[in-house]
A protein has these predicted regions:
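Bacterial Sec-dependent N-terminal signal peptides
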Residues: 1-25
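Alpha-helical, hydrophobic structural elements that either
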Residues: 22-337
Length: 337
């Protein structure tokens, strides 16, 4: 089951009334970066449309559900390799790494390419691996320092492997840069983590516990409504980028026949102010929304923080396995460019 890290941009897709002429930059800023202060009278109409579309989506569910027998070992697959062997895989990855500058979609990118040893691909697939750029110290042909576009790195990559071949052997990891360069000289440090275990909390909607600890995080369930699982992480920063980076949660819905529902599984952050309004009024109109959240309140939404959301196509109505992945093996690699 794949989780798309922080699809807050989905808010835009929820709205049926936003046409292609609208400037997407404000949507990216408000919903993908948590920059509510950029809302103003000129763009507020599109923002209200997006919020209203999101609320409509929360009230709609897919009636056709595909089921599959729940196999815990299959879902929570673990590596058969020892931690020492996994460390040697990272060492091999470091040794085989190559960095290059490429231009794609009119944007210059720093590209890391490498591969794991053959014994790794027999025991794991690359979804087990998270890669994050930690530091970048390089200059271009004019001796000007090259700067990574940190927003792109955090929001789009965030440890996600963007490309892998059919043998799950070669990896490719990309970061945008905002300094025009024909060549680069220097070093890049990446952190590489490998999945080793899962922290699992079994929940029952008919007798729901609302607070629990998982993977060193304190979770408070705000609500499980229809197809969305809304929760707060109490012992972490409420700042958007940090919450986005730490989003490491999934949920499985298991019926009384021990079957799990299949479908899309999205994860993202939502402004607390928005969800609290929806929780009180499922059928809120646009006019009511505008009265409760005038532009000046929209602008201040990020001050009150964000909830975490897991969204499925179908309603949560059975036993729920809420889980977090544990990356027990971690090591930095330094690559020359």
């Amino acid at each position: 089951m794949k989780k798309r890290l922080l699809l807050v941009l989905t808010f835009i897709l929820f709205s049926k009334e936003i046409n292609a002429q609208q400037n997407p930059n404000i949507m990216l800023s408000v919903f993908y970066k948590g920059e509510s202060e950029k809302i103003n009278n000129e763009n507020s109409s599109a923002i209200y449309d997006a919020i209203y579309g999101m609320f409509e989506n929360y009230n709609a569910i897919s009636k056709e559900v595909s089921l599959k027998k729940f196999d815990e070992k299959e879902v929570f697959f673990k590596s058969t390799l020892s931690n020492e062997k996994l460390i040697s895989c990272i060492d091999s990855l470091s040794k085989n790494s190559k960095l290059s500058l490429v231009t794609q979609f009119n944007k210059q990118q720093l590209v890391l390419e490498s591969n794991f040893p053959s014994f790794f691909q027999k025991n794991n697939d690359l979804n087990f691996v998270k890669i994050k750029l930690k530091s970048f110290d390089a200059i271009n042909e004019n001796k000007k320092k090259i700067v990574i576009d940190s927003i792109h790195t955090t929001s789009e990559n965030g440890g996600t492997l963007l490309d892998k071949d059919l043998t799950y052997h070669t990896i490719k990891f990309q970061d945008n840069i905002n300094t025009s360069s024909k060549k680069a000289t220097g070093f890049v440090t990446y952190n590489v983590k490998i999945l080793t275990d899962y922290a699992i909390q079994k929940l029952n909607k008919s007798n729901l516990i609302t607070t629990f600890s998982i993977n060193k995080k304190e979770i408070k369930i705000v609500e499980i409504y229809n197809k969305i699982f809304v929760f707060d992480v109490l012992n972490e920063s409420n700042e958007f980028n940090k919450k986005a980076e730490n989003f490491n949660y999934w949920a499985l819905d298991i019926d009384n026949k021990n079957e799990r529902k299949l479908g899309s599984n999205m994860s993202y952050l939502i402004y607390k102010d928005l969800y609290n309004i929806f929780k009180l009024n499922r059928k809120i109109t646009k006019e009511e929304l505008k009265k409760l959240l005038p532009v000046e309140k929209l602008q201040k939404m990020k001050e009150n923080g964000f909830y975490n959301v897991i969204e499925h196509d179908f309603a949560f109505d059975n036993t729920i396995f809420f889980y977090s992945k544990i990356y027990g093996v971690s090591k930095d690699i330094k690559v020359k460019i």
